[in-house]
From Swiss-Prot:
Binds ribosomal protein uS19. The lineage of its organism: Bacteria, Bacillati, Bacillota, Bacillota incertae sedis, Caldicellulosiruptorales. Keywords: Chaperone, Cytoplasm, Ribosome biogenesis, rRNA processing. It comes from the Bacteria. Belongs to the RimM family. It comes from Caldicellulosiruptor bescii (strain ATCC BAA-1888 / DSM 6725 / KCTC 15123 / Z-1320) (Anaerocellum thermophilum). This is Ribosome maturation factor RimM. Residues 92-167 form the PRC barrel domain.
């Protein structure tokens, strides 16, 4: 498991006083109101204190206390902001962070290894796990539904699924 979780990617500056535009990598954008600070993923010793934030067109605009000019903000462009796992919001039962799902080995209920999760698609109704198939040439798209996903073991690094008709075609 990762010690740090990505909460956003800084994509641009905003204005002249050091604000930045952030694409949120969290389901709950209001989560930023609970965060006192974030860290830069590529330099964990850099702590950025959130002075204020607002949401505009699905982009979070953040003013960090330590950044006061557009030139300083420009240096943050294309960098990820993270928080320590222990500061993350507690997830409900049978809910997982995407970073913990990616990389899991996928088995059917008979123990046959089907592949490895390489990405997660966010859809309107449920997530879809993209599995790099070991048994064929194309990816396996696994709906994240209780009827399909029967067991997830993050610590052991696997997921067991019920193979329904058409899933492996």
């Amino acid at each position: 498991m990762y010690k740090y979780l990505q909460v956003g990617k800084i994509v641009n500056t905003f204005g002249l006083k050091g604000e930045v535009k952030v694409i949120p990598l969290t389901d709950e954008v209001d989560r930023f109101s609970e965060l006192e600070y974030v860290l830069l993923e590529d330099n964990l010793s850099t702590k950025l204190t959130i002075e204020r934030y607002r949401v505009k067109d699905n982009i979070v605009i953040i003013k960090f206390k330590e950044i006061s000019s557009i030139d300083e903000a420009q240096k943050l462009k294309n960098r990820y902001i993270v928080i320590e796992r222990e500061r993350a919001k507690k997830l409900p039962k049978d809910t997982y962070f995407i970073c913990d799902i990616i990389g899991l080995e996928v088995y059917d209920l008979d123990g046959r290894k089907l592949g490895r999760i390489k990405d997660v698609l966010k859809t309107g109704s449920n997530d879809v796990y993209i599995c790099d198939s070991y048994i064929g040439k194309k990816d396996i798209l696994i709906p994240a539904l209780k009827e399909i996903v029967k067991e997830v073991n993050i610590e052991e690094g696997y997921m067991k699924i019920k193979v329904v008709e058409g899933l492996l075609d």
